[in-house]
């Protein structure tokens, strides 16, 4: 199988493993790349030296291309009053686990739009592929990465975002449907069109010149074949890889994905401050009922991480972040290379 995107990415199969910060590992990315797909690591939650170490660890495990994903969200606007109100709202939940709420919240991730040290690191390490989530970095950063010979992907959720990415000069579009697990790539969370994968792929392939990578709800070879018949050049799968032994998903996450909760996923902003889809637990109930205004992403996420840590100290996972897409019930447990091989075989069936 060959198409222009596979040639551009220098991969054999139209299978891309989603970056998934907190779940993806260098071992997972390398296994997917070594099997002929495109493995991915997410460095949006890492500082420069952590990110460099992840890149080098992945490169030591594969001589094939892999994708490095960055968060390009609008930097958070601190609002002490709003943050204090949110912590006061969460205080009874912390008390349930005999823990005080944090005194204050932090902006725990630096957006790539203003992280020029991260840009310099990427220009030094030169990964084959870099992808953007939540938006686009400054044009100067895009131009510098392209000049270094790096292939650029942008996650988009509607036509307006796709046209913006196309105009900026990226090489391909990741069309993320509303079915997808994890954070929505939407540039402006207040303007989410909530388009499903199939409709989005058709709209983008009709209106854009760039290759389209379909993402959201795709779990098997039949799904990959379906989106390619709609015009996609490849598919990006995330939830499908969570049960692989190479992922860093913990036992509670793996158990949930193989149980009844996999059948109920929902999008909420209450966990992090930006919309994201996961398996429903108390995050989706207690944090949304009579809640005050949320702090900005990722400041709100700092509160959730503290609450989950307090619960975990009492052996409770009710507030764990367990991202998953609508295809979650179809997740399969096997090594990543075996899954890629199975997906490729299913595509031909």
Curated annotation (Swiss-Prot):
Output the CDD domains linked to this UniProt entry. NPD_like
Q: Which reaction does it catalyse?
A: 3 propionate 3-nitronate + 3 O2 + H2O = 3 3-oxopropanoate + 2 nitrate + nitrite + H2O2 + 3 H(+)
Name the enzyme group at the top EC level.
oxidoreductase
Provide the binding site for FMN: 69, 176, 181, 217, 236-239
Gene3D superfamilies linked to this entry: Aldolase class I
Q: Which cofactor does it need?
A: FMN
Report whether Flavoprotein shows up as a keyword of the record.
yes
Single annotated GO MF: nitronate monooxygenase activity
**What other remark does the UniProt record contain for this protein?**
At physiological pH, 3-nitropropionate (3-NPA) exists in equilibrium with its conjugate base, propionate-3-nitronate (P3N).
Return the protein name: Nitronate monooxygenase
Q: Which organism is it from?
A: Pseudomonas sp
Gene that specifies this protein:
pnoA
């Amino acid at each position: 199988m060959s198409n222009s995107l596979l040639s551009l990415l220098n991969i054999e199969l139209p299978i891309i493993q989603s970056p998934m910060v907190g779940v993806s590992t260098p071992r997972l990315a390398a296994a997917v790349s070594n099997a002929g797909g495109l493995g991915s690591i997410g460095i949006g939650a890492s500082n420069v030296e952590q990110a460099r170490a992840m890149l080098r660890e992945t490169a030591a495990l594969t001589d094939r291309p892999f994708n490095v994903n960055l968060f390009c969200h609008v930097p958070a606007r601190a609002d002490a009053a709003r943050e204090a109100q949110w912590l006061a709202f969460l205080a009874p939940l912390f008390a349930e686990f005999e823990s005080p709420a944090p005194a204050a919240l932090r902006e725990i991730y630096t957006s790539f739009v203003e992280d020029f040290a991260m840009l310099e690191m990427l220009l030094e390490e030169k990964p084959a592929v870099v992808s953007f989530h939540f938006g686009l970095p400054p044009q100067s950063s895009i131009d510098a990465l392209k000049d270094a010979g790096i292939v650029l992907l942008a996650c988009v959720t509607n036509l307006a975002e796709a046209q913006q990415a196309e105009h900026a000069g990226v090489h391909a579009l990741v069309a993320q449907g509303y079915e997808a697990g994890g954070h929505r790539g939407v540039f402006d969370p207040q303007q989410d069109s909530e388009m499903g994968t199939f409709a989005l792929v058709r709209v983008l392939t009709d209106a854009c010149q760039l290759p389209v990578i379909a993402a959201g709800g795709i779990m098997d070879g039949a799904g990959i074949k379906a989106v390619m018949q709609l015009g996609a050049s490849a598919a990006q799968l995330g939830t499908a890889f969570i049960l692989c032994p190479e992922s860093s998903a913990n036992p509670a996450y793996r158990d949930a994905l193989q149980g009844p909760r996999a059948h109920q996923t929902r999008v909420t902003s209450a966990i992090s401050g930006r919309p994201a889809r996961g398996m429903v637990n108390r995050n989706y109930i207690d944090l949304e009922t009579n809640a005050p205004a949320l702090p900005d992403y990722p400041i709100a996420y700092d509160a959730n991480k503290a609450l989950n840590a307090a619960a975990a100290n009492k052996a409770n996972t009710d507030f764990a972040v367990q991202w998953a897409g609508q295809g979650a019930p179809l997740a399969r447990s096997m090594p990543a290379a075996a899954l890629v091989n199975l997906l490729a075989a299913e595509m031909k069936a």
